[in-house]
Amino acid sequence: MKSKAPYFIILFLVPLFLNAALSHTVFNLRCEQEETPVGLETLQPRFSWQTNATGRNFEQSAWQILVSDSPEQLQNNKGDIWDSGKVESSVSVLVPFAGKELKAGAVYYWKVRNWDKAGNYSPWSQVASFSVGLLSEKDWNGARWIALERDKKEELLPVGLHGFSSYVKKFPEGKKIGFYLLPQFRKTFTTNKTVKRAVAYISGLGQFELFINGKKIGNNFLDPGWTKYDKCALYLTFDVTNQIQNGDNTVGVMLGNGFFNIPSERYFKVLASYGAPRLKMKLAIEYTDGSMQNLVTGTDWKASASPVTYSSIYGGEDYDANREQSGWMMPGFNDKNWSKALDTNWQTKLLSQQSTPLHVRDSISPVRIFKNQKGQWVYDLGQNFSGIVRISVKASKAQYIKIWPAELLFADSTVDQRGSGSPYWFGYTPKADGRQENWQPQFTYYGFRYVAVEGAVPAGKSNAEGLPEIAELTGLHTCNFADEVGCFHCSKPLFNQIYELIDWAIRSNMASVLTDCPHREKLGWLEQSHLMQNSMQSRYDLSRLYAKIMNDMQSAQQADGMIPTIAPEVVHFEGGFRDTPEWGSAFIIDPWNIYQWYGDKRLIEKYYFDMQRYIDYLSSKANDHIVAYGLGDWLDLGPKSPGEAQLTSNGLSATATYYYDVTRMQKMAELLGKKDDAKKYTELGNAIKEAFNKRFWNPSKQQYEFNSQTASAMALFMELVPSENRQRVLDNLISDIRVHNNSLTTGEVGYTYLISVLQENEASNVIYDMNNIYNTPGYGWQLAHGATALTESWQGYAYLSNNHLCLGHLMGWFFSGLGGIGQADQSIAFKQIVIHPQPAGDVREAQTSYQSPHGQIVSNWKRSDKDFTLHVEIPANATASVYLPATNPENITESGILLKEANMPFRGESNKYTVVTIGSGSYNFNVKQ
């Protein structure tokens, strides 16, 4: 979302900000980019806020923050932990704490006020809170990792096996591994004083669900996020004050396998096992008299097998309701037949989960129910999504119900799991009491549109066999519950459909990692975290998820500095599938992009040394500054089936990426004040650029390598092209697109750069032409062939995934190109906004908004033969440059007033635009054509 166009003729200038804000308030308080974070993993939290100002041109001139360990103190305007005093600063994003030392496990309260340029101050904001997590092992008060069973040491596979063939090679006798009982744990305790605060700190591996007195705590799904468990695991923090009752209380926990233990049954992409599922927990209870009570896991807890009889992140889940033990989560339950929990004597580093958890985001009802030729009942949910099903069923016998999810159907309407991993199913055995039961899987998920049911019939259908009857089957779309921050809609139905197509793929692959697909692999392939970053962040606030992704990459980094293609690295692939520069470079590119979007440089500070190690690794792999290995432009459109690059050498794309990494490192070194490093990376970048052009530029043909779209786009975007050749290379790119009848040939690496280069050079009409077609592989092709989420291949092949993240780069153009919301080159966190819509083709209007760290930005435009209208909203404490398609200011009005009379600076550019500089507020521009 950067605007790189230069400014030219200054036409008119008057003082900016003549209208000071008359009144303002502070709202949307955030600590570490979350409203009320619990269990922070830092003693130096950062505070952010936004300002609601009447009128226009609000600029913050100062702020004051109060932090206290008591809300009563704040009510009296006393910050006993930190009173910043009045600080002269316009910064309102990620202001660092500078008060007394914070304590692990403690909760704090804060509020803020600010001043405008005229010296007027706001009322104090509402009070917000944050709490600190457990920062060392001693903070856990002796809590142990407990389990129901001992680990089977001969079956431990912390480095996973890839697929069935490697499993057979490792275990030639075909022995099943990873088969442990799925445990549930309970512990009863007594409180006889008034509870002030109760907090649960819990990690259950692979996944857990926590209950107190029979009530599930929180709405999260698949907690905790998956990691490289021998390096670190995540714990969750829950405020459970309201769940603790006077007298006896019971904690109950159920565990699933997740990625911690993957059994060798049904489908598995990867086979890995760290041992039996296990639990570590501390419940800290603070009483009003100041005393504390800590309940921690140990051998005094009780354990039993749960009704979950099969749990696999890859193969599905089975649940037998007849194995339920009524009341086991409640006080008074007789657990004499339960086992004592076992101490595993296992250790790993525990970190607080700071990324947004997974939730059920949507419920999806069937659009059609029918019987297929196999006699199964098929539910068509109308949408391919990540998630599970929920069923309501009545049964007179304990009949096993098998539920097959699938993206596609074969011609006979049976499920097609070829591209999504087979066999996978949900299994449920109801009780035989004739009562309605509700069930949904707890510890697995899949990507699907269709559901085929065996062993049950829809209620009201013929049921001669007396099978269980399903009163309702609903799809539950599960994904990372990151805030939606961007919206886009335009007058062209096809583009709105493409927007939805990409959005479903983004949502379906936002888990605790950014997966490639929500079924077959569920792995954190790293290339998409930077190639898709702008597109994803236009729609969702991923600031917290990327903090986890960076930690995953650091945990996966090898001794020689190599960053593998996936993180967490649950399996070691081979060749380019383990080590490819365009994938590992996410470790360099991601934190730079995070800094630009959110103003967060802490990731750069934290991982700078390890990022240097990766640059050194790439340098060690280079031959005369050329890096030539890996997968290259994956999934490009060549003569062969999709896969490794066909039209562009991996040397060109890898070296271009290497150069881009080095130039980012130079910028980050300057940001951190590391002048010697900045000089070193400048010199290295110059050497790579020279070598790149020497190797790949063909002076006789005036083109890069084979003149592929990817070669031209990457060279232009990375600024590898000498200035005298830039126009020629741009012409080559556009010419190749036209020669291919406006079709793309790039893969997932090249396409994002192609879109960016065309937009930067105001060639959005070319982007429009490329995506306004149905008859060649691309988005229109996928839609024409029935896709409801982005597919793995441009061709939408049925044998590949039909819900895949990696090719959704047009989403970024919808927001920054067609919609026109971006930021200036040197802007951070959208402090200096650029509104520059590029209408294209027959699109007559577009409505675009983005909730930036400073507040909401709006760009709504509409054009006709007579005029062009643009409604703009800029948040307080930010400014904007607005591009209007006219060179004569006499043709421009704002809210009915001629631009020359509107007290707004403006200037002309490129004999095409008038650029108006505005402050915060709402504006309505009209340009007569």
Model-derived segments and their meaning:
Residues 207, 298-305, 450, 458-501, ...:
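Active-site acid/base region of carbohydrate-active enzymes
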